[in-house]
Amino acid sequence: MISNIRDLKQHVGETVTLQAWLTDKSGKGKIQFLKLRDGSGFVQATVFKNDVEEEVFESAKRLTQEQALTLTGEVRADERAPGGVELSVRRLSPISENHAEYPITPKEHGIEFLMDQRHLWLRHRRPWAIMRIRDCVQRAIVDFFHSEGFVRFDAPFFTPNAAEGTTELFEIDLFGEDKAYLSQTGQLHAEAGAFAFGKVYTFGPTFRAEKSKTRRHLLEFWMVEPEVAPSNHKQNMDLQERFVSFLVRRALDECTVELEMLGRDLSKLKGAAEGNYPRVTYTEALEIVRQHIENKDLPPNVQEDVQPVEWGDDLGAPHETILGHHFDRPVMIEKYPAAIKAFYMQPDPEDSRVALCDDMIAPEGYGEIIGGSERIHDYDLLKSRIEHEGLPLEAFDWYLDLRRVGSVPHAGFGMGLERVIAWISGIDHIREAIPFPRMLTRMRP
């Protein structure tokens, strides 16, 4: 029976067989050290010349990096070894021969080289750990919404209009007769689903033609977007908090090995796992930022010449970074000026200058991970907002239909998966949070 590396701790003192790839090797004299991976984890194997047939030892010496092999040996406890165990090899045989030299050697490589070799780099410890965390979070997303009674609802990738009223769209020529766009969001269609099922969520790729080279932006990323009808602004924020704290708890429960492999300080995630996220208004957030700037109490990656935000302007990345360092867990900033938010957001009945919306800012400078709002449910108000933004009414006629019949207050939000993965994993750039990033300067491999 073939064992896997992740379960070797359960077989200490037993003889097992592994099928694995060689990531690196070293040795001298009568011993060879083989570093192995099999997709489930990493382990070191030792081949002692006196314990094996001569051909086995010679075969071990001939192995090349990333060669696939089958090994049989005894699992031994060793606190010094990664994972607390190592394999003492008795038999070994290559599964196949390599036909080229593996380009990613154990020496240091620059990030651009590694991204050029992304199809191979995924085999290495760092991306392996990040992708395992991504898988864990994706499963947790589905589990959370299932436990809350949501229906998964698939929105189209082709749309005839810009849901956010922006020009950052990938245009598609439909057989020379009409134009369509790659979807920026599944929200509008999810609202239709909410009126049918009460609670729905979409989860899939999203496309934004942003000519940005920042560490927070991708042209193609994954987004989860729940919509609830009926619902309101406060209930929407409560849902966001339950959701994010659930994801962090799941990652801490299931991915300790991967997080420690990345050198992640797990204590930084404990507050997020507990919930109780602070909630401040946009106006209060501006004051927090202003005080930090005046006192020169700035995070290391924020330049000293950063300027305060004037009321009515959006928060920039440096301001979000300041707020993220001010709190020890995600902070929810609510009631932004309506003029800088999307047309479909419900105005605050107590102050029409602001919308019933919020952004969730991750700590440690990771910035916005969620944007949400109560949606306009009144037909006349929504129509006037569409016209005010200069958007074509005919493109939104079906969306207005949702307000013509059976409209109720409803709310939802969008969460960028890769931003959450970057934050939980503690990585600097969002490009590492997706298997094959698509950016302004990268379309391959």
Swiss-Prot record:
CDD domains: AsnRS_cyto_like_N (cd04323), AsxRS_core (cd00776)
SUPFAM superfamilies, sorted: Class II aaRS and biotin synthetases, Nucleic acid-binding proteins
Superkingdom as given in the UniProt entry: Bacteria
InterPro entries associated with the record: Aa-tRNA-synt_II, aa-tRNA-synth_II, aa-tRNA-synth_II/BPL/LPL, Asn-tRNA-ligase, Asp/Asn-tRNA-synth_IIb, NA-bd_OB-fold, NA-bd_OB_tRNA
Coiled coil region boundaries: none
Quaternary data: Homodimer.
Family per record: Belongs to the class-II aminoacyl-tRNA synthetase family.
Database matches in HAMAP family: Asn_tRNA_synth
Name of the protein: Asparagine--tRNA ligase
Organism: Deinococcus deserti (strain DSM 17065 / CIP 109153 / LMG 22923 / VCD115)
